[in-house]
Amino acid sequence: MEVIEKLETIRETLNDTKDKKDFQKIHDELVQYLDGIDPLTIDDDKWNEILKLFKIIIVKLKNSTIKTTSLENELTQHEKKRTVKEVEKVEEDMKVDVANDNSKPTLMDKVLQVSSQPNNPYSADVLQIRTILSKTLFVDTDSEAYSLYVPESQKLDVSPITIELTTIEKYQPKVNILKQAVIVPSQNPLLADTYGAPEILFSTDFFDDITSNSSEGLQLYFFDKAYKLKKELPNLPFLSSLDKDVNPLNPLNSVCKSFGQEKYYDMVMDRTDRGLDARRAAMQFDNVIVDAQNRTVQFNVRMHPFDLQLLRISQQFAEPMQDLAPVVREYMMLGADGYVLTQKTRLDRDQQLIANRRSVVFDRMCELSGPLYRSRIVHSMRMMSKLWRTNVFRTSLEDEITKIYAAAEVSMVSIDATTSALSTINIASAEQTLNALLNMSFFRCELDLIGSQSSFGAAMSAMIALMILPTDQENMDDEVFDVLCNLVYNELIAWAADRPVFVRRAGATNAFRQFVNAGLNRDITNYMRFVLLRRPWLPLYNSRDVRRNAHVLVPNVDLANINDQVYVAINSFLNGIIEASRRNPNPNKTISANSFRKLMKNMRDICVNRLMPVIRLIRYNVERIGMILHMLPYSADIFDINRNLRDERLRIKIPMSGFLSLVMGITKAPDAFDWSQVLNFADDVRKMDYAEAISIEDSASVAIMRNDANRATSKKEIFISEVKPPTPTVASIQKIPSATLTAMFSDRQLINLIRDTHSFRVIREIAVALQAAFDNSPTSQHGVGKGAVLHPVPQNFGRSSQFVRRDNILLQRPAGIQQFTIEDLKQGRYFQGLMAQIRARQPIIVNGPIPLRISDAAEIEQVTLAFLTMNSPYDAYIDPRDLKQQKLLTDREVDLFIDQNPARPNDEFDNVMARTSVFIIDAPRAIVPINPQRLNFPYHDIMVTDSVTKFIEFTVALTPDLQLFNGLLVFEQ
């Protein structure tokens, strides 16, 4: 209701207002007020009433000769926001309808269903993208007629960038410990076995999931588990705290309770258990020693070798860091331009900053995919757009253009025809062009000229553009260069010099090249020759790595010398046009001769006098942002990397009349550079690079490893399923067509870069440690054995350890028995040798991870399936289908039997019946060592940061006028 009352008040005020300045003031205030309104919070009825009032006010302002373009654009933006909200509501309703419907609709059904709605989301997406990217992609703000293909919308889950830093004491041991009693066998068949002294063992619960996740192969299981473990490992190579307690057996010493040691000490301190006396004797020497001078700590632990290996990996492959002090000094030097930067506090010697982790893998992926490269460049442009200082324009150019017309004495009869000469000159074009020029200094782009190409204003603007823009072939396409030259010739030179208009044809595409020696005015010819030199821009800062950032370029125009070639060329060209028009009774197609000559004199003064502030403004911005070139986001030129990929560059739109608008529109010096904002931006880029590198390299490493283990797996599908996009650029990888992504992951250079990443090395080291843990830990109880021995005749059960009564586990492979591996048998290798051993009734050993079927004592004692398979292993292990194909078709299970129940006496009948032909090969159980392992780690507070600016205090010390680094003022009135 407040909005409606405000608009009613403004409408009444307009009725009483008569002065044009007051109308303009009301218009500007209304634009600001409309910008502060949130259209999504207003009801439909109230919004319709507000629209009516706005339209009435706009009509009144137009009647008062006030240009209302900005107000109408703002109102259109608000309407589009409401349209997008309605579209989202319609799409949600559609999803509910589709969920209720059993049949799945096709894409065409969706399109037809949506098209019947009052608001079509496909067209709405176009409008929304136009709204969001208009300033970034430099879409023509005047013309509504353009097409844009929008694929089917996808929701992208982009998580905020957070960097979690964990120290070593946060590590949770993966291998638990347990206390288990020894079984003492009875020599008397009438007496049951008894329990002996207990022992502390390492458990193997860590491999509980091995049967459910190793169906595709044990190697894939190791890689998947290594990837999960990498996320759980600490990423800082030091301790910041340690859980200590007094040694209960020696009050002068301390014991470490971290890393799961508290559980061990609780077990050992059971004084009723005399079997642990040796452990208690060793425990009294456990101690924690802190060296405050060297900042280290030594302590005792009893951990499984696998846990110790993971600790070493986490310390060796901790996240790379850099010293904070040099970076703070660099920031202080950068901000010395107009600011005084001081450290807030003294920095500790161990104060660290996360290193600049720039992913060469991501850079290579951008080189292989044009859409991904452009997406990343657009994202970088969007990030950098907030850094520019371009608040140098007046609110409107209408008064300026009116003065030019008045000075040219244009009669009111021909005002319509003349108005078209400068009708495209406006502030929107100037801002768009200035943004384009600033971005072209850091990014290499292709130009796309838009707007009218047949007016006097566009021709004057093209004449200036040929002086400012880089016209060399590497930076400007021949087509764009020809269009600019032909426009200047046809609209300015041909009419003024009374020459025929140039028409493009095969072999003659450039008017300047065609007529440079055709006897034109000498001043005009000099300008044409200077343009045909096709001069590039000057390099201002060289990039350290062209695969990451392109060189920073600036226009090749002098900042102080008015006799520079560019200024002289423009001045002489306009003098030549004026001179030629003196002898010509009809020097322009729409403007009378006298008016044209006076108009050209005014334009000469404007172009020559106001070009230098434009060049200084560009240099003022580029000089300062270029100083942090090595901290900026990705801005590489794909043409530098591969000369065949010029078409993959981003194409930016520049209004044809933008350069004249820019020259006429600058009226003041820009705002001062806020170095606090610029250096905070550098911190944000460092965090973004870190998050992108982690996300890309982790998922790519898993994809390569899984493909190495099984060539049938798709690297592309694994990568897409594993990647967690931290930025829209990473999320855009999911939109790359399937075949293109497959081709990218076939690139040998990309794969080699992935293999050389920090993530790949960590995951590979963890997988190797997992393989060693599997080989040396008992895993038969979890359903997987190291191998099996198949006998032709049933044998007595053995006893693999002192913790069981009997079992069919062997800890060593018997000598003198033929061995086969499962992989060979599945490939059909040596299968005939296996059959020969079976026919000869010889025992065989099958090596490799073998799935097990666990049986209990009751099943063995009765004639059950377990009894039969354990006593006829050949028939159970070899299937008739294997004989047809002469290879092992699938992994076959074998029986595992463990009897740990001593609560009954031995029975002769049991001993006769309970025999087996299958023995499982496994590793022995690991006993927790009595004497501890001594660990030594750095020990200090967490002094790692991802932000430098929070350690710096900014104090403004600005000069009265804004200057370039060489002392020149940006703008002089």
UniProtKB/Swiss-Prot annotation:
Whether RNA-binding counts among this entry's keywords is yes
What keywords tag this UniProt record? Capsid protein, Inner capsid protein, RNA-binding, T=2 icosahedral capsid protein, Virion
Gene source species: Rotavirus X (strain RVX/Human/China/NADRV-J19/1997/GXP[X]) (RV ADRV-N)
Q: Which family does it belong to?
A: Belongs to the rotavirus VP2 family.
SUBUNIT field: Homodecamer; each decamer is made up of two conformers of VP2, called VP2A and VP2B. Interacts with a VP1-VP3 complex. Interacts with the intermediate capsid protein VP6. Interacts with NSP5. Interacts (via N-terminus) with NSP2.
Q: What is its main location?
A: virion
- InterPro entries from the UniProt entry: Rotavirus_VP2 (IPR007779)
Q: What is this protein called?
A: Inner capsid protein VP2
- GO cellular component labels: T=2 icosahedral viral capsid; viral inner capsid; viral nucleocapsid
What is the top-level taxon of the source organism?
A: Viruses
| Any one GO molecular function term | RNA binding
Q: What does this protein do?
A: Inner capsid protein that self-assembles to form an icosahedral capsid with a T=2 symmetry, which consists of 120 copies of VP2, with channels at each of its five-fold vertices. This capsid constitutes the innermost concentric layer of the viral mature particle. It encapsidates the polymerase VP1, the capping enzyme VP3 and the genomic dsRNA, thereby defining the core.
